[in-house]
Amino acid sequence: MTRTILFILGGVLLGGIIHIVIVFLVPLYAGNDAWAEMGRFGPDRQFHMLPAPEAGAEPIPGMDPRMLQAVCRFDLGNGPLRVQAELPDEFWSVAVFDRRGRNVYSLNDRAAEGQKLDLAILTAVQMAQLRQSPPASLENAIVVDLPIQAGFVLLRAFIPDDSMLPSAHTALAGANCSGTF
Protein backbone atom coordinates (compact mmCIF):
# COMPACT_ATOMS: atom_id res chain seq x y z
CA MET A 1 0.00 0.00 0.00
CA THR A 2 2.78 2.43 0.94
CA ARG A 3 4.64 1.51 -2.20
CA THR A 4 1.62 2.31 -4.39
CA ILE A 5 1.19 5.71 -2.74
CA LEU A 6 4.90 6.47 -3.29
CA PHE A 7 4.61 5.50 -6.99
CA ILE A 8 1.55 7.73 -7.40
CA LEU A 9 3.23 10.69 -5.66
CA GLY A 10 6.41 10.16 -7.69
CA GLY A 11 4.40 10.04 -10.93
CA VAL A 12 2.48 13.21 -10.07
CA LEU A 13 5.69 15.01 -9.07
CA LEU A 14 7.52 13.91 -12.23
CA GLY A 15 4.53 14.86 -14.39
CA GLY A 16 4.41 18.31 -12.76
CA ILE A 17 8.12 18.89 -13.31
CA ILE A 18 7.90 17.84 -16.98
CA HIS A 19 4.85 20.07 -17.48
CA ILE A 20 6.57 23.13 -15.99
CA VAL A 21 9.74 22.58 -18.04
CA ILE A 22 7.74 22.26 -21.27
CA VAL A 23 5.76 25.43 -20.55
CA PHE A 24 8.99 27.39 -19.97
CA LEU A 25 10.58 26.01 -23.17
CA VAL A 26 7.67 26.90 -25.48
CA PRO A 27 8.94 30.46 -26.24
CA LEU A 28 12.35 29.09 -27.22
CA TYR A 29 10.85 26.75 -29.79
CA ALA A 30 8.09 29.01 -31.08
CA GLY A 31 8.83 29.95 -34.68
CA ASN A 32 6.57 32.99 -34.70
CA ASP A 33 8.52 35.52 -32.66
CA ALA A 34 7.63 39.21 -32.88
CA TRP A 35 10.29 39.89 -35.54
CA ALA A 36 8.97 37.14 -37.82
CA GLU A 37 5.42 38.36 -37.28
CA MET A 38 6.35 41.91 -38.39
CA GLY A 39 7.77 40.46 -41.62
CA ARG A 40 4.25 39.83 -42.94
CA PHE A 41 3.67 43.57 -43.41
CA GLY A 42 6.34 43.96 -46.10
CA PRO A 43 10.07 44.07 -46.87
CA ASP A 44 12.71 45.02 -44.31
CA ARG A 45 14.02 48.57 -43.92
CA GLN A 46 10.77 50.20 -45.02
CA PHE A 47 7.96 51.58 -42.90
CA HIS A 48 4.62 49.82 -43.38
CA MET A 49 1.36 51.22 -42.05
CA LEU A 50 -0.33 48.82 -39.63
CA PRO A 51 -4.03 48.14 -40.15
CA ALA A 52 -6.50 49.61 -37.68
CA PRO A 53 -6.94 47.37 -34.64
CA GLU A 54 -9.99 45.12 -34.53
CA ALA A 55 -11.00 43.35 -31.34
CA GLY A 56 -9.12 40.05 -31.14
CA ALA A 57 -7.22 40.59 -34.41
CA GLU A 58 -4.70 43.33 -33.58
CA PRO A 59 -1.45 43.14 -35.55
CA ILE A 60 0.31 44.00 -32.27
CA PRO A 61 -1.31 43.15 -28.92
CA GLY A 62 -2.66 46.11 -26.98
CA MET A 63 -2.87 48.59 -29.88
CA ASP A 64 -4.59 51.88 -29.09
CA PRO A 65 -7.29 52.73 -31.65
CA ARG A 66 -6.44 56.46 -31.36
CA MET A 67 -2.84 55.85 -32.47
CA LEU A 68 -1.77 55.49 -36.08
CA GLN A 69 1.15 53.06 -36.28
CA ALA A 70 3.85 52.09 -38.77
CA VAL A 71 6.47 49.36 -38.41
CA CYS A 72 9.93 48.86 -39.93
CA ARG A 73 11.73 45.53 -39.51
CA PHE A 74 15.54 45.51 -39.64
CA ASP A 75 18.67 43.39 -39.26
CA LEU A 76 21.77 45.33 -38.20
CA GLY A 77 23.91 42.61 -39.77
CA ASN A 78 23.06 44.37 -43.04
CA GLY A 79 24.42 47.68 -41.73
CA PRO A 80 23.25 50.47 -39.43
CA LEU A 81 19.70 51.80 -39.58
CA ARG A 82 18.55 55.40 -39.85
CA VAL A 83 14.99 56.45 -39.06
CA GLN A 84 13.85 59.87 -40.25
CA ALA A 85 10.41 61.45 -40.14
CA GLU A 86 8.59 64.78 -40.00
CA LEU A 87 5.90 64.09 -37.43
CA PRO A 88 2.68 65.93 -36.51
CA ASP A 89 2.39 68.43 -33.66
CA GLU A 90 0.37 66.00 -31.56
CA PHE A 91 1.97 63.30 -29.43
CA TRP A 92 4.19 60.80 -31.26
CA SER A 93 6.60 58.11 -30.14
CA VAL A 94 9.14 55.77 -31.62
CA ALA A 95 10.15 52.48 -29.99
CA VAL A 96 12.76 49.89 -30.93
CA PHE A 97 12.03 46.26 -30.10
CA ASP A 98 14.25 43.18 -30.22
CA ARG A 99 13.32 39.93 -32.00
CA ARG A 100 11.16 38.76 -29.12
CA GLY A 101 9.22 42.01 -28.91
CA ARG A 102 10.96 43.47 -25.85
CA ASN A 103 11.33 47.24 -25.89
CA VAL A 104 15.03 48.21 -25.93
CA TYR A 105 14.75 51.92 -26.73
CA SER A 106 12.00 54.52 -26.92
CA LEU A 107 11.64 58.22 -27.52
CA ASN A 108 8.67 60.57 -27.78
CA ASP A 109 7.92 64.11 -28.89
CA ARG A 110 8.63 65.52 -25.43
CA ALA A 111 12.10 63.98 -25.19
CA ALA A 112 13.05 64.88 -28.77
CA GLU A 113 13.49 68.47 -29.83
CA GLY A 114 10.79 69.49 -32.30
CA GLN A 115 8.76 67.34 -34.62
CA LYS A 116 11.66 66.10 -36.73
CA LEU A 117 12.86 62.61 -35.88
CA ASP A 118 16.38 61.60 -36.91
CA LEU A 119 17.51 58.40 -35.21
CA ALA A 120 20.51 56.19 -36.07
CA ILE A 121 20.55 52.64 -34.66
CA LEU A 122 23.83 50.73 -34.58
CA THR A 123 25.58 47.81 -32.90
CA ALA A 124 28.57 48.49 -30.63
CA VAL A 125 31.00 47.49 -33.42
CA GLN A 126 29.27 49.78 -35.92
CA MET A 127 29.36 52.60 -33.36
CA ALA A 128 33.13 52.17 -32.90
CA GLN A 129 33.61 52.34 -36.68
CA LEU A 130 31.37 55.40 -36.89
CA ARG A 131 33.37 57.24 -34.24
CA GLN A 132 36.53 56.91 -36.35
CA SER A 133 35.02 58.91 -39.20
CA PRO A 134 31.60 60.35 -38.31
CA PRO A 135 29.60 61.63 -41.29
CA ALA A 136 28.44 65.25 -41.15
CA SER A 137 24.87 64.13 -41.90
CA LEU A 138 24.63 62.65 -38.39
CA GLU A 139 25.41 65.95 -36.67
CA ASN A 140 21.81 66.47 -35.49
CA ALA A 141 20.83 62.80 -35.29
CA ILE A 142 20.20 60.82 -32.12
CA VAL A 143 22.73 57.99 -32.36
CA VAL A 144 22.20 54.90 -30.20
CA ASP A 145 24.03 51.61 -30.04
CA LEU A 146 21.82 48.74 -29.00
CA PRO A 147 22.71 45.23 -27.85
CA ILE A 148 20.55 43.62 -30.55
CA GLN A 149 21.16 42.30 -34.03
CA ALA A 150 17.61 42.28 -35.39
CA GLY A 151 14.35 43.90 -34.40
CA PHE A 152 11.71 46.36 -35.47
CA VAL A 153 10.92 50.04 -35.07
CA LEU A 154 7.37 51.06 -34.19
CA LEU A 155 6.43 54.65 -35.01
CA ARG A 156 3.17 55.93 -33.48
CA ALA A 157 1.21 59.16 -33.92
CA PHE A 158 -1.73 60.16 -31.73
CA ILE A 159 -4.98 61.02 -33.51
CA PRO A 160 -7.04 63.23 -31.13
CA ASP A 161 -9.88 63.49 -33.66
CA ASP A 162 -10.57 62.23 -37.16
CA SER A 163 -9.68 65.56 -38.79
CA MET A 164 -6.02 64.91 -37.84
CA LEU A 165 -5.93 61.50 -39.53
CA PRO A 166 -4.80 62.69 -43.00
CA SER A 167 -1.82 64.70 -41.68
CA ALA A 168 -0.72 61.89 -39.36
CA HIS A 169 -1.09 59.32 -42.14
CA THR A 170 1.00 61.50 -44.49
CA ALA A 171 3.69 61.90 -41.81
CA LEU A 172 3.96 58.17 -41.10
CA ALA A 173 3.77 57.24 -44.78
CA GLY A 174 6.64 59.65 -45.46
CA ALA A 175 8.85 58.21 -42.70
CA ASN A 176 12.16 56.77 -43.88
CA CYS A 177 13.79 53.64 -42.51
CA SER A 178 17.04 52.90 -44.35
CA GLY A 179 20.75 52.40 -43.92
CA THR A 180 21.90 55.55 -45.68
CA PHE A 181 23.88 58.13 -43.75
PLM ranges: what are they?
Residues 1-181:
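A compositional/structural signature for long, glycine/proline-rich flexible linkers
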